[in-house]
Amino acid sequence: MGSAAVLVANRGEIAVRVLRAAQEAGLRTVAVYADGDDAHVGLADEAVPLAGGYLDAGALIEAALRTGCGCLHPGYGFLSEDADFAGRCAEAGVRFVGPSAKTLRLLGDKVRARELAARAGVPVLDGASGLAEARALLAGGPLMVKAVGGGGGRGMRVVRSAGELAEAWERCRSEARQAFARDEVYAERLLEGARHIEVQIVGDTTGAVTHLWDRDCSAQRRHQKLIEIAPAPELPDSLREKVLDSALRLARAAGVTSLTTVEFLLHGGEFRFIEANPRLQVEHTVTEEVTGVDLVAVQLRLAAGDTLADVGLAGPPPAPRGVAVQARVNAEVTAGDGSVLPQSGRITRFDVPTGPGIRVDTALRAGREVGTRYDALLAKVIAHAPHGGVEAACARARRALAEFAVDGVRTGIPLLREVLDRPRFWAHTGVVAEHVRATEPGAPTWQDGSVTAPMSGTVVSVDVALGEPVRAGQQVLVIEAMKMEHVVRAPASGVVRRLHARVGGTVTAGALLAELDEVAGADPSEPEDARADLDAVRADLAETERRHGFTLDANRPEAVAKRHALGRRTARENIDDLCDKDSFTEFGALAIAAQRRRAGPWTS
């Protein structure tokens, strides 16, 4: 691998995971760390401080060169999918452990990846790359606005009405810029009630590509994965083969030379590609447990020039052995309205579970501070059951979480245990939200004109001024926590009397941000969104227009062809010739004959 040393350009549990794998491979290891974030550095042979943080590409490359590292492992998040960073590493003579810059430009850009998938014959969702296109697409139903780069649920918002689109677009851009150093976003059709399935791909520089089966990631809240399962349960063999084949076709088209995950949404017997992540995934652990393949070690060897044959993956993929489940233990709690509240504090107790089939990936220990600057992930608990199927693996994971004792900060362990106890929690991506709504108390009510912080974090914008009238639901300010932006809205209509927050300031959960004086005669329950958007297309109108489209000749090619074959014209062709443009008004295009007595009532 050139110089037998690797710089790990990340933090937390993934830095620990890569450092250990590199040391087992006989490599000298170098860690980097930001101020106050050095929990992982004890495992490295050498550590370099970062003044500019983990997105400072120049500092990372300079640190690799200064410490004699021939390669750099980006982990996940931060710069792991940044093609320019990979290119700069290559120019400096530092091997980037991951796909080539060319592949990263293809797959690290979700819009380009969608286009590549479509060309490769992989089914995709309808999408829009610009705000104007997104407005048009929204007329046909709800959308998901997503960051073009990165992942982890950051830079994602569901949009159901035209009034929500512009704000969601800007929030996604801002989150993406903070987390991934790029702010492009796009939109695609929201497919609700679907499962989230992904395929682990491995490729080498000879063009050989294979898969290591699939994972189910449907247990999510706010588009962030909570629990993953390998292999995906209740997936028919015929459908699994189609999904695996589609993932391989895309990987070959992209020229994958390392690890990549190809992600799909499944609904009924159909599936659609949503994105490809050309990097190590947080949930790589469950694939390792059921296949026996050390994915980080494979990454390092492929970066050194080894082939799939060299790492023992040239033949058929190893058959999955049992089932593995991963639960992400985060420093956060989830409110009944679905909002996620990051937690911070000093960990006073951190007792991880042990026992057969239990693995815990973490960088933390008692005495460490947990803040809101980075991801909320404290640890990953992985349970593997060689026998007994997904039920046995889930039961083992529940027991492990019951033994996991964390004091000093609140965690999501109670929610994880509840979800794992729920039958078929992988049925679709909305199951966790349904569970939270049914079991958790709602958001706090407004009292005394106070606008308070729902979580600890940093104020990134203040959007009102003293004396300004605001309406219920209007954006007051934005708090950034764990690289996610959270809009704080006015709980009722009023006038801003005091502002206690400033841009760049840090606030704690429950802190007073602003005070409002209620406006006499105002309806405090009427949200800002209740005001009519004159440009908005109502969902029922959009659906009616869509159905009307079925009656047009352009959407009836077989009927038109049949009419022409008889030497005749369609009624609409006659109308077009007889009437001036836009002068013909049609009523009842969707009316049908009254045939209830003959055909009986509809049953669908």
Q: Where are each of the predicted segments found?
A:
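Terminal-region recognition feature
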Residues: 528-604
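N-terminal beta-alpha lobe that positions the nucleotide/phosphoryl donor
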Residues: 1-262, 266-281, 569-571, 586, ...
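Short, compositionally biased
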Residues: 489-497, 520-536
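Generic structural motif
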Residues: 345, 451-459, 490-498
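Short histidine-centered loop motifs in beta-beta connectors
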Residues: 454, 461-469, 498-502
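Short hydrophobic beta/alpha edge segments that flank linear recognition/processing sites
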Residues: 468-488, 508-524
